[in-house]
Amino acid sequence: MMNLTISGKQNIEFYLLMVGLGAAEAYKYKHISLGVFESLHYDLSMIVLIDEYQLSKDLREIVFQGMGMEDIVDAAEWFEDFDWESHLRDAIDYLELDCISRLMEPSYHTCINDFTLFDVPNTDSVEHLYISFVSHHSFEQIMMIFMLGYTVFLIELGEYCTDAFDTFKRNYLTSLRAINRGESEVLSEVLELFDSCDNGNDFLSNKRQQLWLRKISIDLRGHFFRLKESSMNYRSEKGLVYYRRPKETILN
């Protein structure tokens, strides 16, 4: 069983927004189903978590937006001429833009520099979110969704991408590599993709890095396309469980 700990409300929100962004990106390209999309982030149980931690109203609204995708899909059964695919695509684009613009707010600037998924809590003065993955497979899938969200975010940072990308590699990818220890070939391959992303210092290096990150996002999305939906059910304890305190379940 794999376990992660995220400390502090801002870091918890930052993580949830990244997972929400990654889920939206994978769903937009039809590489995960609506059911998987909802179980990853856009579910009433996530509202319970947000309320429990008294997280931001904006994050709450983003989750409700994602839950609204089901209404668009259902409308296709009721209205013969309803162009539900165009409406759905626009709704997902809107959702992604909300996630990205929220992540760019000043309150999350410190998260870009300091965020880590592998905290060791040493104080009760801040909130902690404990995440238990029942299998290495579920850990692998959620990490891929998180990395997909982070990759999309880095691309949108444009000229400010380089420093944020270096921090992402230092604070997150290095720790993930140590935890994975080659156990998952899929994660190892993804980490190699990030390692080979060129961040030289010539005048086109920033643009070249963004293009490489776009290629990585395509590879990450493609991974989910090859999975069976039954292997990505996060509405049960077969996948992951969130805790407010160790061994105290608040969401699964």
Question: For each of these PLM feature ranges, what is it?
Answer:
Residues 1-252:
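Acidic, Ser/Pro/Thr-rich low-complexity regulatory regions
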